[in-house]
């Protein structure tokens, strides 16, 4: 059984032209299992799988420090 019990989707709006760079940066982060550039309201959607909500909070806090990210939303699976 996997120890990564918390699954979340992180959406971000980024500065124009930085979509691919930010998505690549996210994909290299620990516990980010997928990072996609999308069309529509959100520029990037990333899937995060981690051990607990405290670790998820730390990951989201670290992601939000990326200067090209201007707006975010996170959905946590039940």
List PLM regions with ranges.
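A compositional/biophysical signature of low hydrophobicity enriched in polar/charged and small residues
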Residues: 1-78
